[in-house]
Amino acid sequence: MSTKQVTCRYFMHGVCREGSQCLFSHDLANSKPSTICKYYQKGYCAYGARCRYDHTKPPAAAGGAVGPAPNPSPSSGLHSPHPSPDIATSVMRTHSNEPGKREKKTLVLRDRNLTGLAEDKTPPSKVNNPGGCSDPQTSPEMKPHSYLDAIRTGLDDLEASSSYSNEPQLCPYAAAGECRFGDACVYLHGDMCEICRLQVLHPFDPEQRKAHEKMCMSTFEHEMEKAFAFQASQDKVCSICMEVILEKASASERRFGILSNCSHTYCLSCIRQWRCAKQFENPIIKSCPECRVISEFVIPSVYWVEDQNKKNELIEAFKQGMGKKACKYFEQGKGTCPFGSKCLYRHAYPDGRLAEPEKPRKQLSSEGTVRFFNSVRLWDFIENRETRQVPSTDDVDVTELGDLFMHLSGVESSEP
């Protein structure tokens, strides 16, 4: 079957971009789907002359009581969406005489602007001559309303009834920096804020002025704190790599690793590498490389913090941020976290319940030392027994030989 016998579905909708080079047929004579605008047939096409569908009225059925209607052009005025009483009567009789079908009720729109049946807008000619057709040019009140017009309905009343509509509005261009209209601007130019140097203060609204000044002052203080922190951080040198941290080549390495119990300066990458070393014991890698003070965790920061109060705030913010992330060792109750109650991450079950912190378990060794551990496994005892040091046979032989000499000497001296 040739594709030329198949009607192009894009051409049927008026959007075929292939044109004459299309492999399908552009003949609408054999096409069953119609390109007539269904909204225009109902009388309220919002696109008007810009609609890509045909604005034509199809002829009525042969058995209908009304003759064929003329085909208006898209540029002509829209007809009234309400059928005449004769048409409505014939349609109702046709549906009521069909056996086996339920009677359909006509949908009634409650919004007058959608239906166009406002009683106060009905011209006298329509009341006097209910069967006649009114000219849309002579009666603009009877023109059908679009959906956009229905949305806009009541906005004027809403603006008029608002409490602040009578007050002049601030010019958005002057508030942003400069208004090219100057004194001829229809909007109100506000007073200049002494902090942000913008015309954003309403001269007649003290609440707006107070709120903006409070917000502006808070932003100004925050920016000043950042400026002071940057000034205090720009010459800090890492004690491990001996480089200025904020002058490193990579932007990801320009971060400080602040120890919780120490005030020495390190970059984040160096102190993390130090604490990940495997050849040292745990107390050594947790301590500061310079002063040997043990710190439980490292806080990443863009700026250097030396004040203890600011440092405490940074530690609390760091703990709160870590507490929102799920612990990868706990695994929602499926695993065991080796850090126990000291873990900064979130220990929660699948249903959202938080796990109670485990109490550290103690073990007393034969030497009298106490060690803490989180879990006890049978394999740990088996491995400890297998790796336990066994005395060598050479030591046993030497011990037995010494006992023999002592025995011989003791026997000779003890005889009577």
UniProtKB/Swiss-Prot annotation:
Its Gene Ontology cellular component terms are: cytoplasm; nucleus
Pathway assignment: Protein modification; protein ubiquitination
Q: What class of enzyme is it?
A: transferase
PTM annotation (Phosphoserine): residues: S139
**Cellular compartments annotated:** Cytoplasm; Nucleus
- ZnF bounds (C3H1-type): 2-29, 31-58, 165-192, 321-350
Nucleus is among the record's keywords: yes
What protein am I looking at?
Answer: E3 ubiquitin-protein ligase makorin-2
Organism expressing this protein natively: Mus musculus
Q: What is the lineage of its organism?
A: Eukaryota, Metazoa, Chordata, Craniata, Vertebrata
